[in-house]
Amino acid sequence: MAQNLYGPRVRIGNWNEDVYLEEEIMKDFLAKRDKGQLLIQRNRRLKENLLRPMQLSVSEDGYIHYGDKVMLVSPDHPETEADLFLPGDLSLCMTPDEIKAHLSNELEVPCGLSAAQTKIPVGRNTFTILCAAGEVIGQVLRYGQNFRLGITGGFDDRMLYLSSDHRTLLKSSKRSWLQEVFLTHEDSYLNCWQAAFPHPQLRLEYEGSPVPANTKILITHCHTNRGLVAHRHLFLRTYFGQEAEVAAHTYLDSHRVEKPKNHWMLVTGAPRKDLSTMLDLPKPPAEDTRALEQEREQVSDPGARSTPDARGCVPQCTLPM
């Protein structure tokens, strides 16, 4: 049997080189920690910026203006083409590549996009309505007017623009292989978008009218004439979990009307301090709900039926002659 002939204090092998190597590794680790270049530090910094709480613009007149900070939300609708999909309202979010984000202190360009189940305005889903042809900040956005959508991602020194271009063999969306939508820092004609009224028969009548906030609209790319769409049934594994794919494609039904997957809302902030967006406001009761409440009150209180109101009077009994 092998027997250890040396005591615990005896050093064997290249012990001197191993000591110097451990010292160099520790010095390199401390230097990266002081500069903030460790992987955990970059990961924490990226999440802090992308998930930084943002304040949306409050619309006083109910319309969208240039310079407003909004969220692009795909309203909830039943998905009939697939059994497995993401339900609820989906907001357009920037999705940087996890590996590339850890190798650099800045956001990658171009940067990907996805649709996530979040209604809280943060750095990764808060967009700014920017001018495209010399419009004035604060001017009302109108149907058929060009505009740009910019996002900072929580960073203060960089602006990325929502862009798209024609599909090629080397450049397309990851799951559907349709026209890709991405974020870039270049200010060009690929950044221009237009808002259109959802109903095709009333679209020309609403041309030039102000775009209302928190209502369904169509967002079309000016260069390719493709509509922004959220594929709820196509999932992406992103830095923040499972989210839906976003592309540029117009889906039409048998009546040549855009499908609900092409509908979007420009969501603004709520005037109440305890709410973040207008989607958090409680909805007023509908007319049919009020009618049901009145019927329930009459059933619970039979004497209320004989109470006179503005619609009629109490029937009177006639004595026999």
From Swiss-Prot:
Subcellular location: Cytoplasm, Cytoskeleton, Cilium axoneme; Cytoplasm, Cytoskeleton, Flagellum axoneme
Keywords: Cell projection, Cilium, Cytoplasm, Cytoskeleton, Flagellum
Gene Ontology cellular component terms for the protein in this record: axonemal A tubule inner sheath; axonemal microtubule; motile cilium; sperm flagellum
Tissue: Expressed in trachea multiciliated cells.
Subunit structure of this chain's protein: Microtubule inner protein component of sperm flagellar doublet microtubules.
Species this chain originates from: Bos taurus
Protein's UniProt name: Cilia- and flagella-associated protein 161
Main location (coarse class): cytoplasm
PANTHER family: CILIA- AND FLAGELLA-ASSOCIATED PROTEIN 161
UniProt-annotated stretches for the region Disordered: 275-321
Signal peptide extent: none
Record InterPro entries: CF161 (IPR055325)
Its biological purpose: Microtubule inner protein (MIP) part of the dynein-decorated doublet microtubules (DMTs) in cilia axoneme, which is required for motile cilia beating.
Any GO BP: flagellated sperm motility
Superkingdom of source: Eukaryota
